[in-house]
Amino acid sequence: MNYAKFIDHTLLKPESTRQQIDQIIDEAKEYNFKSICVNPTHVKYAAERLNDSGVLVCTVIGFPLGATTTATKIFETEDAIKNGATEIDMVINIGALKDGRFEDVQKDIEGVVGAANGKTVKVIIETVLLSDEEKVKASELAKAAGADFVKTSTGFAGGGATPEDVKLMKDTVGDELEVKASGGVRSLEDFNKMIDAGATRIGASAGVQIIQGLESDSDY
């Protein structure tokens, strides 16, 4: 198993500097991660630096609250792709989900999927804010809207991925969608728990530590 290809090497802190972006780009090239995930303001620079590297550029839409309008999310998506993004991680309208306005939630996702024009779309449902029933419904809506992944968390809402949530989401979407676990995945042990639960992508700022943990474990 190529562990690095499961990892979206992530830096989404609002205070991220160009120097820090350079660091994760260099690490992504060195370890051959699947992608780097950065805020939209860094996409164009990252895409230029990662050109022909094999490392994808992922960005976030409606992040971290999911509370912007669908039109805004569509514009953000189109702008990100124009700047070189190849994967889109969007946040659902969490309040609409809790209201039971499921059509609004699905249309919001569909808007981003349409704007992405074939690029990979991962739908962040923010599991820490949801009941199990809501997690299932959100996953079903992501599936119905034509997304590629359902994703656990932004990492900004006070909780992250759990193996239990990953399994619930995977059981809901089956083989039609993949599951991305993000938020709090900091070690090889965490990584393995998420993969065992059904995740096929891991969003982590600790990608290097995870891979180094793998390397150190392989010495025994």
Curated annotation (Swiss-Prot):
Top-level taxonomic group: Bacteria
CDD domains given in the database record: DeoC
InterPro entries: Aldolase_TIM, DeoC, DeoC/FbaB/LacD_aldolase, DeoC_typeI
UniProt subcellular location: Cytoplasm
PANTHER family, A to Z: DEOXYRIBOSE-PHOSPHATE ALDOLASE
HAMAP family documented for this protein: DeoC_type1
Similarity comment: family membership: Belongs to the DeoC/FbaB aldolase family. DeoC type 1 subfamily.
Record field: catalytic activity: 2-deoxy-D-ribose 5-phosphate = D-glyceraldehyde 3-phosphate + acetaldehyde
GO CC, alphabetical: cytoplasm
Keywords associated with the record: Cytoplasm, Lyase, Schiff base
UniProt protein name: Deoxyribose-phosphate aldolase
GO terms classed as biological process: 2-deoxyribose 1-phosphate catabolic process; carbohydrate catabolic process; deoxyribonucleotide catabolic process
One GO molecular-function entry: deoxyribose-phosphate aldolase activity
Function: Catalyzes a reversible aldol reaction between acetaldehyde and D-glyceraldehyde 3-phosphate to generate 2-deoxy-D-ribose 5-phosphate.
Pathway(s) per entry: Carbohydrate degradation; 2-deoxy-D-ribose 1-phosphate degradation; D-glyceraldehyde 3-phosphate and acetaldehyde from 2-deoxy-alpha-D-ribose 1-phosphate: step 2/2
EC number in record: 4.1.2.4
Active-site annotation: 89, 151, 180
UniProt enzyme class: lyase
